[in-house]
Amino acid sequence: MISHEDVVVVGALRTPIGRATRGKLRSLRNDELVTAAIRGIIEKTGIDPRLIEEVILGHCLSSMEGNVAARMGVLRAGVPVETPVMIINRLCGSGLESVGLIAEKIRSGRIEIGLAGGFESMTSYGLPKEYTLSRGGACEDAEDCMLTLGEVSEMLGKTHGVTRSEADEYAVTSQKRALEATKKGHFLAEIIPMRVGDETVERDEGIRETSLGTIESLKPVFRQDGVCTSANSSQLSDGASAVLLMKRRRADELGLPVVAEFIDFIAVGLKPRDMGLGPVVAIEKLLKRNGLEKDQISYFEINEAFASQVLCCLRKLQIGEDRVNRYGGSIALGHPIGASGARIVCTLLSVMKNEALEGYGVASLCVGAGHGVAALFRRAAGSKPQDIKNT
């Protein structure tokens, strides 16, 4: 049974994902990425920007500059000055958490229409600067927060028996799926073409033809005997994403088609050295809270930080690869960290629509320093007026 008070998604769009420092989006500032995503979703849905009551965007690699960039980009997209804008930073989970925050504001009645999303120009910042603290302190878990994501992925892979060949095979599969989806036009509905200079950019730049033979000779990045290489790890990227949510009643009044219903969001903590298993903990807790089993979920999008990391998650969750990341993931598409959480919502809903998957879909990411996030959506083929409760 559906209700007029349900929180629903009426649009989920993103920019193409550019390769950081050398891609076609490298000349764009953060605020320009924001403008592209927000303007794109306003134009695609046809919503009057004056109806948007709040904007929350995920962003990671800056604080003050990010807040200013978000505000500038949103204003330039046509959203009025009266609409408040803020950024949040839960690292790779930021974009998905923004969706959860806007949804909860709508559910609580504080707003009726809101925009979520995320942005990141990793070109602008490159790799985060390393810092050190003395090891062997009083709190081992606190010290483990300094572990790089690659180190954590290597440890998880070793613990769960992920081999180099398995990681490479997964990476090749991700690239092949993304390339096939691109050729078939499956991303067209979620990507906002961008005019950069004299060129229109409308494809993700990280997707490429590859094979085991071309990547098996690459050297490990984090350990000499490790499994993580530049080919089976996510890419540094530039991009932005946007998700428009509102009450179902408002969608009906505005004549906007419902893409999916937002059900729930969760953030969890776990040992920092187990960070890569964040999706396992988050998904299991999310499903339990909503009285669901994994076999009741039609489809999963789990962010591909590293092939070894996502393989560990699939093994722990006991989910077949055919139910996950059918159009590839961050290994192929790229990982603009502040935007990726909302990006996987875009792709989750694209897959479910294109593949005619009804029922529940889950989006999830691992998050640095020992966290995981997950969100639950429901997609139906349609509803009749008598199916709607006047609540």
Swiss-Prot record:
Catalysis: reaction(s): an acyl-CoA + acetyl-CoA = a 3-oxoacyl-CoA + CoA
GO BP, one annotated term: phenylacetate catabolic process
GO molecular function: acetyl-CoA C-acyltransferase activity
Cited InterPro entries: Thiolase (IPR002155), Thiolase-like (IPR016039), Thiolase-like_sf_Thiolase (IPR050215), Thiolase_acyl_enz_int_AS (IPR020615), Thiolase_AS (IPR020610), Thiolase_C (IPR020617), Thiolase_CS (IPR020613), Thiolase_N (IPR020616)
Gene Ontology cellular-component annotations: peroxisome
Catalytic center residues: C92 (acyl-thioester intermediate), H335 (proton acceptor), C366 (proton acceptor)
Enzyme class: transferase
Keywords from the named record: Acyltransferase, Fatty acid metabolism, Lipid metabolism, Peroxisome, Transferase, Transit peptide
Alphabetical list of Pfam families matching this protein: Thiolase_C, Thiolase_N
First-listed, main subcellular location of the protein, grouped into a coarse class: other
Keyword Magnesium tagged: no
Top-rank lineage group of the source organism: Eukaryota
Compartment(s): Peroxisome
Matching Gene3D superfamilies: 3.40.47.10
Disulfide pairings: none
Enzyme Commission number, as recorded: 2.3.1.16
Subunit: Homodimer.
The protein, known as: 3-ketoacyl-CoA thiolase, peroxisomal
Organism: Encephalitozoon cuniculi (strain GB-M1)
Primary gene name: FOX3
